[in-house]
Structure formats: C-alpha cells, structure tokens
Amino acid sequence: MTDKVIENNQVIIMGKIVSDFEFSHEIFGEGFYMVDVEVARLSDSYDIIPLMVSERLLDVEEDYKGAYVCVSGQFRSYNRHEERKNRLILSVFAREIEFVEELEESSKTTQIYLDGYICKEPVYRKTPLGREIADVLLAVNRPYGKSDYIPCICWGRNARFAGGFNVGERCEIWGRIQSREYMKKIGEDQLEKRIAYEVSVSKLELVEE
C-alpha cells in the first residue's frame, strides 16, 4: 500500500544549493529543515525550489551553498494559516540526495509525475496574447489518509483537454516544477512580492477506473 502511494508522487530535481538550512519542524525526534535549490530552466532563467530535508539525510550544520545535488522525493503541500486565510505552502520532500560534480547542459533539471484526483473545477482561459491556459488542482493521496494539493498549469491543447475535466476524475500528470512571482495586495494600498509554485504540465491523461 505505502509503496503504491509513493509511486503516485515522484519528483527529481537537479540544481545548486543557494541557502542555509532553516529549521521547519520535528516529528518523533527527527528534525526537518528547509533549504533552497536553484534549478535551471531551458531558457537562461532559473527557479528557486524549496526543499525539505531530514537531518538524517544531510548534516544540516554544514554550509553546502554552491554544491550541486540530485534529489528524488515528492512534491508536498500543507496549509499555513495567515491573515485569517489558509495559504498553500509547497516544497519538495527529499527522500534521497546525491551530490554531483556539475550538471550537464542536456540534463533535465526537474521532472515530476503525479497520479491524483481533480479536486476543483478546472479553469480554462486565454491570455491577452492568445495563449490557452488551464489551471488544475490535483489531490494526490499520501499514506495515513493525507493528501497533497498540487496546482498544475496546462498550455495549448493540454489546456483545452483539461478544461473539460470534472471534479473527482483521476488524472496522471507529467511535467516540471516551476516558480512564479506575483504581487499580493496587503491592506488598502500595500503590495508584497510572493512566489507561487506549480507544475507546468507537458503531458496529462485521464485514468479510467
């Protein structure tokens, strides 16, 4: 059962550690820490992806900034309560970490596979420049009755396809994790820069159950 659940949420990221470790929480005496990994895109830009690491995987007292890593794990979410609202916080939960000398130009720096359920009516729209986009929120089951809620963004014909999905349908998604900056209105006239994380979908299929 547990192995099957782990198979439905698989992530590989390759990139450079660019921050110190910051304590997140402790479970049964095991400490978990957050660290940022810079992951290159195909263009010249990059994404900063938050990584959650157990103190049993890495020495969290060490300074690893500048080190290249290959991480396999899962894309996880949890709700943080702030400003009388719940905010969805996303990070890659590391299961294995391997240090690498450097990253090859051709290597895929982030890959993700999800098998979950549509938990919100997909929103299909066109941008002012005519690009077709659909937003999909996927609930991916975890052991012990928990679920991760993963925002996914589809483009072009994938967006048209996803626009017809119904809540409760099972869907497989392949793609990459990306970050996106946006401005959040705080109070009447104040804006705060925030970063959202989502899966940019390259392929998706409905699963007949």
Task: Kindly give the residue locations of the regions a language model identified.
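OB-fold and OB-like single-stranded nucleic-acid-recognition modules
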Residues: 1-209
